[in-house]
Amino acid sequence: MTPEELLAARDRVVPDVVAGGLRVLFCGINPSLMTAATGHHFAHPGNRFWPVLHRSGFTPRQLKPSEQDQLPGYGLGITNVVARATARADELEAEEFRAGGRVLSAKVEELGPLWLAVVGVTAYRTAFGERRARIGPQERTIGGARVWALPNPSGLNAHWTVATMADEYARLLAAVGPAGTPEPRPTRSPQGGSTTVTSTPNSQPGPSSSR
């Protein structure tokens, strides 16, 4: 990937990986330039989302970013608070987070996941006005889903290691419970309007950057 190709990806929107009735909808801050250039979430080489997802027990093996479409088969999905790609999350304005929070609430209400997991507590605080929020389960619900704030897996987040993040993600998994048997179902991303072939777990009802 050349620097020119990365720069050309600025402000690009990456389609969600979603389905109705997910166990967990993971929500990043916004796409990195690498994610926008490849179309694969959490694609930056320094991002630890995929190894943490595996080590915590959400997936039986470590998926590659290019294998993201397998996630709905495990009852998992990915979206973002802010849709547009930037080189760093600090390029985003507070109002973008608040507007993204409103879009996310509507999206969650439409898709009906059991849990919304925001990977970045600072983004969660800004988007939803929860200034005192801490890592872990939250008291509020969003769009009918329970909420868990997770540490940002970006390599720039030096406060958390892969091991300590995996422990926190495993706490969420314990709260979510085991996966059901998935069945195929195509769905359309409410955010970007792009179709992704996904699946719906039949155990549920209803339908930083540096990522």
Regions found by a protein language model. Give the residues of each.
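Short, hydrophobic/glycine-enriched beta-strand segments
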Residues: 18, 23-29
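Short, surface-exposed acidic-centric catalytic microdomains
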Residues: 35-95
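Internal catalytic-core helix/loop-beta-alpha segment
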Residues: 73-132
